[in-house]
């Protein structure tokens, strides 16, 4: 008899039948310390030990998407295993051998006005062949075409499809992309976000997760396909809850431009969607000419040495620094082309920056202010206006414009607020990489601050070091320019 007998409980969980000592070894293998746990209230109040446990020793359940990891565990520990077929859910591991790469290529060419690239065909082929996949593909690599191709495939097989995105803008954008590819999108797709009807007979639903995560399990019963765009956000409890309610969704596909770099993050997402597959890297897209080439100028503002007791003290100093804000204003007004300025705090930084820039610009030059309180329709209108402009400035919060918004005619991005988040930084860079009709090059201006006191580096300077690590990992070209700044 095998050491582990693995079966499907449903399309969310596997059940592992094994001896208690194997359960404890599996628990060790699939337990991780969350990198940011020490900052969380539950950890500080000692209600939680800061660990994520992906294997449940009480019932033997683990996410279906981690099957490959379990098989590797068996090999490493020299355990035997076997798959047991479920009457309703079938075998834990299935491969669709009838799907060929040539067939996928022909199909993608037949359903779209745009010619798919080789790596897009590879990604769709790998996804359809294995039923579930976490596809890692950077901004401007054509994720929406891959999603569209998968959607069309399952629509043709009469399956109900749920597409989950993080923002209302992305609901509208994906709907428009599908129409742009030549599909009669109105006959098949229904959009859900604030104020939209949730009940529909449409075969495809495109929705924000915020609109559906509180709905009962029964609502999700009809879906056999789930697609998560910007899947790196699916580690949150609300999104995990949605995926857990999709007990009959056999086909699961997550799309993201980047992961956080932590093993915990990757394994949770693989558990929800399936094994990860890296389609292509940004620097490869640049070499092939699919995206604009990128120059990064790190503008390191040198402040008088100052010691801050807390991170918040330093942030308040930075965002309220008049010379720093004037420097950003002058930079934005002097740059040629359309410019996106990203900030973290609306009232404390975004609004003062917008007022400063808008009051000093020439007449008829568009300066836009975008944050969470701006309606989706207004954001879309700003995007469309910018596409036809040559010197527009958008002052936007990271939350609204760092993820998924497509503006081809965008030439410059300014990081006005410090951030060490790998995902946020790479997604923000992605905003400027799309090629336009007269655009082949883009520039990122990374505003950083050296306020070091004696041998002690300031908090946000450490954030810059984390960003530079990312630039090196992605093989981006960057220069660091020191700029003295008076108090």
Task: Show where each model-derived region lies.
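Walker A/P-loop
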Residues: 129-152
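A short beta-strand element within the Helicase C-terminal
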Residues: 223-224, 396, 405-418, 427, ...
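Conserved Walker A/P-loop ATP-binding site and its immediately adjacent core
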Residues: 144-180, 345-347
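Conserved helicase ATPase core of P-loop NTP-dependent helicases/translocases
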Residues: 172, 188-200, 351-352, 365-402
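Conserved segment of the helicase C-terminal RecA-like domain
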Residues: 431-465
